[in-house]
């Protein structure tokens, strides 16, 4: 995994940290054998829940540590893992300052105690290490309780580990930043970063009838509206018009059977849904019913501001996004960014007609 970094004059005028003070951090989990060769095993469990490695890499390095200066930094984070979700935080409890998400800068910085980052999502942080020479800041992933097991039994509370010694929700060290000599003078973080043209719900062509996509598991495949990927297939309800603004709704109904018997009973899995060729705005979230502690824990770290192309849809949740299909006609993909879910069918084409 790598990054394309796109800039423009508006961004350059902000005076954000640049050069050596602009750090990409690509977070992945992998498994290795005794010869330090990557091991990727595909089995029924991985296919159901997604691959989870037992080693955390940052920019390809395990036990990542970097020397930084006592100055402000721009940290560009990408979750490049197959299926692992991170609940990011500074080890000392310092709030995280978020300045950008998938599609670029936010209108203004926002702060979070924790930051939930699902596969395929990107986020940018502004971090000020000035006056901290000789200290260490560690970016960690805090523990969360994971997701429901199969039937509450067969695989126990740790089933979301898929055989990994690091299940989804395990506490993790991500990267250590060792703060050395004084660096460049710190410019104040602008209170205004960009101007985002907000989509208007009343301009959506389907304002009263959102285009709905039901996410489920049937047997050993993951489906969208009871369909799986076919190379050239586009259903009638997957055709949109160039220039139209639409409401798309992703409904994650996993957790109740799905026709696969014991192997799908009570499976609750999150789905980071990604739409190719567009940037969208998150309109609303309808949380799962009941007192869902996992949802409450992770949703505190959502950043739905700004432009997105990937949104995490939790078990039992419905998420609506506003998306305009502009610039290009043609056939595009939308899919779950859990790579094993995608490979197991949770990917479809949609067509933009001019």
Residue map of PLM features:
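Histidine-centered copper-binding motifs that mark active-site loops
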Residues: 1-126, 145-152, 156-217, 221, ...
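Short, surface-exposed secondary-structure boundary micro-motifs
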Residues: 9, 30, 78, 128, ...
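Hydrophobic beta-strand core residues of beta-sandwich domains
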Residues: 67-68, 115-117, 131, 238-242, ...
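Short beta-strand segments enriched for Tyr within beta-sheet-rich domains
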Residues: 73, 123, 135-138, 246
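Short, acidic/polar linear motifs in exposed loop/turn regions
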Residues: 81-83, 133, 253-256
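Active-site pocket scaffolds in enzymes
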Residues: 97-109, 206, 210-354
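Short, hydrophobic beta-strand segments
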Residues: 123-131, 321-327
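Short, surface-exposed ligand- or partner-binding patches at beta-edge/loop junctions that are enriched
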Residues: 130-146, 327-339
